[in-house]
Amino acid sequence: MTEAIAVVESRAIAPVQDWDVLQMLLEDHRSPNTRRAYDRDLRLFFAWWLDEDPHPEAIAYWLSLPQSEAIAVVLRWKASMRDRGLAEATINRRLAALKSLVRFSRRLGRCTFSLEDVKGDRVQSYRDTTGTTPERFRELLALPNRQTAKGARDYAILRLLWENALRRSEAVQTRVQDLEQGDRRLWILGKGKGRQRLPVSLSVEMVQALQDWLRWHPKAEPEQPLFTALDRRSYGQQLSDQAVYLLVKRSAEAIKLGKRLSPHRIRHSAITAALDATGGNIRLVQKLSRHSRLETLQRYDDARQDFQGECTEHLAKLLG
């Protein structure tokens, strides 16, 4: 009796160094900003530790370290960043990138140690939520010549940043089809929402400003970006985050605002103005800001009312 021998084709398992774990980690995150930050911070770590880029072999070597040695390396890196005077938030962000790489590798079975016992530096939670006033922002809005393509576009962007407290990434990632003119609604990619678009309501004036810009739009088709570049080299392409930043910065300089203004500070200004207009109705303004935590808005409200400054004035009066 003869037995048939089945030949089974086998695939060799790729050695550890052939796994591009860093690339897999980056692809596991939706946010382009997160991917860029992780890539940059991990490159800085490997440059400090091995004087090399984080290529697969270097990462495989890092992931093969025993627990005690890995933690010792990270603690030395943390100390070196402190010695260079880096801010606590910067140190914590770089540690978070490295911890994320290790956690991801553990899930893949490519790492046996953990960095969860390495603690970040304590960061003061205060944030400067000041920006500009509605009166000064009206001056800024008067700058663009709305009878030109660039002026119509810039006016619409500035007004949208203020009225809807948008982040600049939320503004530039919108498409023509995301604007529902009849319903006065714009669908945006909100922070932390992946690829899910969220609706924001628009004022009549905002819809009119967007309609004025669309008459100049290089190619106002549904899938096209709502805001496009108008320079010769990038004509018709999606407007970049940096272009919006420069628009705000130069506009503030043109009206001699006297302080630095950025798209995010316009967002701060809009949220603060909304708190003023609603008598500090935090829950209502949360619908505008789309903050997930009320505590964040509470900081805006505290800064708006300046309770500490009020107490200082009382104490000063006690001195006569």
From Swiss-Prot:
What residues does the Core-binding (CB) domain cover? 16-106
Domain named Tyr recombinase is located at 127-313
- InterPro entries listed in its UniProt record: CB, DNA_brk_join_enz, Integrase-like_cat_sf, Integrase_catalytic, Integrase_recombinase_N, Integrase_SAM-like_N, Tyrosine_recombinase_XerCD
**Keyword Cell cycle among UniProt keywords:** yes
Active site per UniProt: 167, 193, 264, 267, 291, 300 (o-(3'-phospho-dna)-tyrosine intermediate)
The record's subcellular location field reads: Cytoplasm
SUPFAM superfamilies reported in the protein's UniProt record: DNA breaking-rejoining enzymes (SSF56349), lambda integrase-like, N-terminal domain (SSF47823)
Q: Which Pfam families match?
A: Phage_int_SAM_1 (PF02899), Phage_integrase (PF00589)
Family under the similarity heading? Belongs to the 'phage' integrase family.
Alphabetically ordered keywords of this record: Cell cycle, Cell division, Chromosome partition, Cytoplasm, DNA integration, DNA recombination, DNA-binding, Plasmid
Give the organism the record lists.
Answer: Synechococcus elongatus (strain ATCC 33912 / PCC 7942 / FACHB-805) (Anacystis nidulans R2)
Where primarily located? cytoplasm
Please report the name of this protein according to its UniProt entry: Tyrosine recombinase Synpcc7942_B2651
Q: Which GO terms describe its cellular component?
A: cytoplasm
Biological process annotations from GO: cell division; chromosome segregation; DNA integration; DNA recombination
Enumerate the GO terms in the molecular function aspect: DNA binding
Q: Give a short account of what the protein does.
A: Site-specific tyrosine recombinase, which acts by catalyzing the cutting and rejoining of the recombining DNA molecules.
